[in-house]
Amino acid sequence: MFGDTANKLILDAKRSSNLSAIPIYQSDLVKSIVRETNDLNKDAEYLVEEQEQLQETQDQENSKINQCQLFVTHLSMRRNKRCLLAYEKSRADKITEFCWLNIDPIETSTSSSTTSTNTNSNVNQSSSNNAVNPLTKNLSNYTTSLDMNNLNHHEQDFFKQYQDLIMEFKSSFEDIDLSGDLNPPTNIFIDVRVLKDGGEVTTEYGSFNLIKDSQFFVRKSDVERLIQQGYLEEII
């Protein structure tokens, strides 16, 4: 039935919106929808020609039937187009989310048993590299990992060009942290919980190991990068 394939694509986009990673591009579904839309377009052209013939013969009854068929065909084509655009837009939004993080997409696609992080160096790099979008508050489904192999060719080009735009934009305001939080911090020190294992973290006040489910009372500025990258969550 027309529209079933597009519905599957939208369901995939809905599931992907709750993930912290971008899943593989559904090229087969997209191609099927494009083929279906082309077939519908051929049907629409045939119905238009038939409508012209019916008008010449003044067959009112069949003309109304033809008009209904043509109307439904156009609606199906428009729905397929909307579903395709919604799918592409949802993936583009997640790609732009990831672009604001200072994470290498190739490294995030490979598993590592230990991760060594120095937050002091991350803070220094944040003024010249990408950081999390300041408008994003809920990081539970924020895009924190990206496998370039899951993107199609056009998405890979979009990712690289968007990164270049961010770097060019931020280079004009070197003295301003454009990626900083728009709301002032309520507390200097916060309680955090470790969400996944990592390596040793060195801060100005000492070191601690990222062990899943462990909790720490740390200075917020020292662990902001780890929160953005999905290693920690703030306990409120």
Curated annotation (Swiss-Prot):
The keyword Cytoplasm does not apply. Its main location: nucleus. GO terms for biological process: DNA strand elongation involved in mitotic DNA replication; double-strand break repair via break-induced replication; mitotic DNA replication initiation. Gene3D superfamilies: 1.20.58.1030. Residues 109-130 have a biased composition (Low complexity). Residues 109-134 are annotated as: Disordered. One of its GO terms (cellular component) is nuclear replication fork. The keyword Lyase does not apply. It holds the Pfam family Sld5. It is found in: Nucleus. SUPFAM superfamilies: GINS helical bundle-like. Keywords: DNA replication, Nucleus. Belongs to the GINS1/PSF1 family. Component of the GINS complex which is a heterotetramer of SLD5, PSF1, PSF2 and PSF3. The GINS complex plays an essential role in the initiation of DNA replication. This is DNA replication complex GINS protein PSF1. It comes from Candida albicans (strain SC5314 / ATCC MYA-2876) (Yeast). The lineage of its organism: Eukaryota, Fungi, Dikarya, Ascomycota, Saccharomycotina. The gene is PSF1.
